[in-house]
């Protein structure tokens, strides 16, 4: 288990791929804190020693990119001890997070990227062996094959777990997702308005599979 072999583990991935749920389920023995909470962030920034007294290792810090100064404190802790599995960090802003990690925890952290559900997970197919070009492998895999009755439904829903846990309308889900993405992620990185960014997303989505042409996208956005 790489988590137990590393002093610090970072789990990154898009919002709503259930990073926190996975970590809480698999590592329930870890203490937990979340930097979505402003008071928690203030304490971590202004009184880091007290923060770690209140939140001892092993510790899971969610949305860690929201208070990047804590990474220097984590660096000191992991450098002073040979104990493994001290920290699990997670966050949704990959660019901002990786910048902080490269500056403070380079060579000290194992990085995992959690994607959305695969087709096997969506269809609850238990067969998960790595591909091997042999007849035995193909025969074994064939016993687990399932028919994809409505591939368009899968395309529209995408791979976010929430859309398969409950009967959630996918249009409502993605509308809320874009709004949250704008308010909580994009606006922290660049100054833009919601209409312009929505037009950008639409222009890029309409060109899926095409060669990237910045001029055409800029023309659509106006």
Model-derived regions, located:
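Pre-Walker A adenine-sensing motif
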Residues: 1-4
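Hydrophobic anchor at the beta1->P-loop junction of P-loop NTPases
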Residues: 11
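Conserved lysine of the Walker
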Residues: 19-20
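Short glycine-rich substrate-engagement loop in P-loop NTPases that contacts/grips substrate
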Residues: 30-58
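Conserved catalytic/switch belt of AAA+ P-loop NTPases
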Residues: 71-95, 99-104
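Short regulatory helix/loop adjacent to the ATP-binding pocket of P-loop NTPases
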Residues: 95-111, 123-128
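Interdomain hinge/linker elements that couple catalytic modules in large macromolecular machines
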Residues: 124-222
């Amino acid at each position: 288990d790489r988590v137990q072999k590393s002093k610090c583990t970072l789990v990154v991935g898009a919002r709503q791929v259930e990073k926190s749920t996975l970590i809480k389920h698999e590592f329930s023995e870890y203490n937990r804190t979340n930097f979505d909470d402003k008071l928690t962030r203030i304490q971590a920034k202004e009184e880091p020693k007290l923060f770690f007294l209140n939140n001892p290792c092993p510790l899971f810090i969610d949305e860690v990119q929201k208070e990047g100064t804590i990474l220097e404190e984590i660096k000191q802790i992991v450098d002073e001890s040979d104990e493994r599995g001290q920290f699990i960090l997670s966050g949704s802003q990959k660019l901002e997070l990786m910048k902080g990690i490269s500056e403070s925890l380079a060579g000290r952290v194992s990085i995992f990227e959690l994607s959305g559900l695969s087709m096997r997970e969506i269809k609850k197919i238990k067969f998960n062996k790595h591909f091997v070009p042999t007849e035995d492998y193909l025969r074994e895999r064939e016993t687990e094959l399932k028919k994809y009755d409505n591939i368009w439904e899968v395309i529209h829903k995408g791979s976010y777990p929430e859309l398969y846990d409950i009967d959630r309308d996918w249009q409502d889900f993605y509308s809320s997702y874009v709004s949250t993405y704008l308010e909580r992620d994009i606006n922290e990185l660049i100054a833009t308005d919601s209409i312009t960014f929505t037009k950008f997303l639409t222009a890029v989505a309409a060109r899926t599979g095409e060669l990237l042409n910045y001029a055409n996208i800029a023309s659509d956005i106006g």
